[in-house]
Amino acid sequence: MKALVYVGEKKLDFREVPNPVVNSGEQLIKVDSAGICGSDMHAYLGHDERRPAPLILGHEASGIILGGDRNGERVAINPLVTCMRCQACISGRENICSTRQIISMAPREG
């Protein structure tokens, strides 16, 4: 697939990257629209060490699910990747999951 990759301060490269691996409980989404957030700009300007180059930025997106029971469904992407097993997740407070990851921050690409 093609992606715009952050490769260093104020540097982006439009390139071919490997297709994403879809893990259990995840969906493959063909992104139709993506927003540029303030945190993406911080990374682009070199002000966020949590987003080291090279990295596919972007965590505000929408698109269409490809495959599975929900094939073709239009969705907005929740950028949080959580365990869904801890007390916070079980009680509906995934935003404070102690193992949460955010799409577009290592180790998760955007």
Residue ranges and their predicted role:
Residues 1-2:
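Extreme N-terminal starter segment of soluble prokaryotic enzymes
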Residues 7-10, 81:
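A generic beta-sheet turn/junction motif
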Residues 10-14, 38-39:
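Short N-terminal binding/cap micro-motifs at the start of the first secondary-structure element
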Residues 13, 84-85, 96:
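Generic structural signal for helix capping and beta-alpha/helix-loop junctions
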Residues 13-15, 50-52, 99, 104-107:
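A short, acidic/glycine-rich surface segment
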Residues 18-34, 47-90, 109-110:
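Glycine-rich beta-strand-centered segment in the early N-terminal region that forms part
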Residues 41-45, 90-109:
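Iron-sulfur (Fe-S) cluster-binding segments and ferredoxin-like electron-carrier domains
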